């Protein structure tokens, strides 16, 4: 890696950019400047710069080292050594930890050319209310970084293979002598030729530019379990992005977004429904049909039922995702009063009121019967 390159500027992102923002910028620019697509004289060099920038900023350890020293050259952070400069010890950030870590305990760190699992991905899946209750089988499509089909992930041109790095002899790291406030010290850093892989690619694959990865459309069959709720997620192992140095694929997390129902409310495995009945049904009792997600069922309404009374329909709710059985449906009744009555209905109610000792007052329109008999 060349010194004094502004990798953030190359990718067109800010220094506080998230990992996702860096990845998106890399994908966009690598496609834009790919030599097979862009025939501009400087396209190949820009393509190399973009890949070089992502090799650093796309790796948290390499990015931290780059941010610490301000360039790809770790010596740049010391500004010529000594205690000079504007900040003294503060100029080094976490430098002492890195120095002593590599000098005394560097062997405990993970090797940079060790296989690493690929990135995890998220997929938002919209479900209808009933689909979340009963589950469904579907196929989803999404874009992911996969192993290059041309080189099989090696990054080398077809017919060639990566060779052991001539600079680090396959270790992925090199020893660098640095001038520090404590004198000259030797520290270990990622090899700038193979970028920590231990392998050197003499002729890069024209499809992926030596990264071993390309953006590909991917399909996967999904079985949505019955009883899922809004916001819950399901993990599909190995359906994320390709790994590094022979590492496994990452995972895919499907996040469910359940659409609300016009008829029902849901709380876990319990379903709630509002049912209207007439004041005659409430007074005399009746057997009515109530809709459920499982189909219509009969419900006996006892005589004298009041507005706000709740009934429970056993087993007519949603399946319990964790545990056995199914929840219930709760039916809350609302007694409705007609706004207009014909003469026969009015006379019948007057007789009912008289028999009940509730003769209408006849004064104004404040009485119960006056509200719907006039």
UniProtKB/Swiss-Prot annotation:
Taxonomy, superkingdom: Bacteria
Role description: Participates actively in the response to hyperosmotic and heat shock by preventing the aggregation of stress-denatured proteins and by disaggregating proteins, also in an autonomous, DnaK-independent fashion. Unfolded proteins bind initially to DnaJ; upon interaction with the DnaJ-bound protein, DnaK hydrolyzes its bound ATP, resulting in the formation of a stable complex. GrpE releases ADP from DnaK; ATP binding to DnaK triggers the release of the substrate protein, thus completing the reaction cycle.
UniProt keyword annotations, A-Z: Chaperone, Cytoplasm, DNA replication, Metal-binding, Repeat, Stress response, Zinc, Zinc-finger
Record region (Disordered): 308-328, 347-374
Transmembrane segments: none
Cofactor(s) recorded in Swiss-Prot or TrEMBL: Zn(2+)
GO cellular component, one term: cytoplasm
UniProt cross-references to PROSITE patterns, sorted A to Z: DNAJ_1, DNAJ_2, ZF_CR
Gene: dnaJ
Subunit composition and interactions: Homodimer.
Protein name as it appears in the record: Chaperone protein DnaJ
List of residues binding Zn(2+) 1: 148, 151, 205, 208
Coiled coil: none
Binding site for Zn(2+) 2: 165, 168, 191, 194
GO biological process: chaperone cofactor-dependent protein refolding; DNA replication; protein refolding; response to heat
UniProt key word Cytoplasm: yes
